[in-house]
């Protein structure tokens, strides 16, 4: 079973993330940031991973620390659940449309953290959610999961649609990358022999 649980406690946030990479898309989400919960639900449902995330943060100031630290903790949990990466596909990609919006996400479990985030948001906020926090979420994730992640919103007018297609595509790309490949059972997916 590829399951991991990580707890992260700082003076700003207290976060617990549990993930099952071989799940069915079930989720239990309570981050205190409703729009973040909505986006995490997209990862679970479209990535077919089970997510149980609870966060308490200094949201009386703003949502920044909570959103960033959930990304960090999720990255740590994914890295722990993937383990030595033997037998995984390593790479994943997805294009996801939602009405006028279209996004592409490509991920590589390379062991080299890197984020290319190109989303020309049409608004600064979706409800009360600051769209810049999505960058902080993914930066925290890549730095602690040890992945290279390319996120491109190819078109979109509605900022909610733009970000929702990003999170859905991320879930689907993650699912593809961590999927076990029977033909590569027990092998590290790299000519170097390590990732």
From Swiss-Prot:
Its EC number is 4.2.1.19. One of its GO terms (molecular function) is imidazoleglycerol-phosphate dehydratase activity. Pathway: Amino-acid biosynthesis; L-histidine biosynthesis; L-histidine from 5-phospho-alpha-D-ribose 1-diphosphate: step 6/9. It is an enzyme of class 4 (lyase). Belongs to the imidazoleglycerol-phosphate dehydratase family. HAMAP family: HisB (MF_00076). This is Imidazoleglycerol-phosphate dehydratase.
């Amino acid at each position: 079973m590829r399951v991991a649980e990580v707890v992260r406690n700082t003076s700003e946030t207290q976060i617990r993330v549990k993930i099952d990479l071989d799940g069915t898309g079930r989720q239990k989400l309570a981050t205190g940031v409703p729009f973040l919960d909505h986006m995490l639900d997209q990862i679970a449902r479209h990535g077919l991973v089970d997510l149980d995330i609870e966060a308490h943060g200094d949201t009386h100031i703003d949502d920044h620390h909570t959103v960033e630290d959930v990304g960090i903790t999720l990255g740590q949990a994914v890295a722990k659940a993937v383990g030595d990466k033997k037998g995984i596909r390593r790479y994943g990609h997805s294009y996801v449309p939602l009405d006028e919006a279209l996004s592409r996400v490509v991920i590589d479990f390379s062991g080299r953290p890197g984020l290319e985030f190109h989303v020309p948001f049409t608004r600064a906020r979706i409800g009360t959610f600051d769209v810049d926090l999505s960058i902080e979420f993914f930066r925290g994730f890549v730095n602690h999961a040890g992945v290279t992640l390319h996120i491109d919103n190819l078109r979109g007018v509605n900022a909610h649609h733009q970000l929702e297609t990003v999170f859905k595509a991320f879930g689907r790309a993650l699912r593809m990358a961590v999927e076990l490949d029977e033909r590569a059972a027990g092998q590290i997916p790299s000519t170097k022999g390590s990732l």
